[in-house]
Amino acid sequence: MSRISLSEPWKKLVWVATTVCNYNCTYCAPNLHDNKNRWPENYYPVIDMINRFRKGDPLIVDITGGEPTLWPEFETFCTDLVDSHKNKTSIQFTSNGSRSVRYWDRFSAPIDEMAFSFHTEYADTEHFYQIAKSLHLRYNTKIFLMMPPNRLTEMREFYDRLEQSDLQIDVATKLIKHHDGTGLVDGYTPEHHDFSVQRINRTKYNKVKTIDTSTVLYNGDKISAQDLINTKQDQFLN
């Protein structure tokens, strides 16, 4: 029998830190931007809870919202969380990228990976390009192009600009799902689906030392977890 184990003993915690958001996207679940749940006034109990959860293991903390960067103490929270434990704490977060370029120029939190969702109902392509330019040499930076059916041309143009740049970023396109989990919204064509599988992969994950969540030990050898899935070697019979 083959033995599969994690290549590093990590855990992952996803935290919806706030439902305060400056966007009101039509396809976003209402409870994620209802502005009812603000960030904690005192975040040290949150750090204590996180460290109890990890039980000494290396930990990935994925922070979402709402919009996390609206929290005035977001950067200091990240710094204090990393400093609170001797083992590795890898912080990731998702943002709509709406803060000013000046904000991102000054951003210095100990983040291992930041993901930006480009929402065509509000976001500006030039602004997004400039924040990617500000961050790509300092952070592992991903951009997800959220593509409603009527924005294919705009998404293609922005994707092409990013692809032709020298920015060390990852870019992927996401088709919009109903927020109640009933599948994709109506209006997508084969052209949309063909475009949605295109990827830009240029971060190389070389800015910081991250916890490796993409590989496992398979009979003692480190291999890609996705390769196991693709070849159905992750499936077992009773």
Over which residues does each language-model region extend?
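Core AdoMet radical
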Residues: 32-41, 56-71, 82-101, 109-128, ...
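A short, flexible N-terminal coil/short beta segment enriched in small residues
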Residues: 3-15, 49, 58-70
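Radical SAM enzyme [4Fe-4S]-AdoMet core and its adjacent flexible, acidic
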Residues: 113-238
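N-terminal [4Fe-4S]-dependent radical SAM core
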Residues: 1-14, 228-238
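N-terminal cationic-hydrophobic initiation segments that often serve targeting/anchoring roles
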Residues: 51-54, 82-85, 108, 136, ...
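Generic structural signal for well-ordered alpha-helices
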Residues: 47-50, 75-79, 104, 128-133, ...
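Short microdomains enriched in Cys/His and/or Lys/Arg
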Residues: 43-55
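Canonical Radical SAM [4Fe-4S] cluster-binding loop centered on the CxxxCxxC motif
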Residues: 4-44
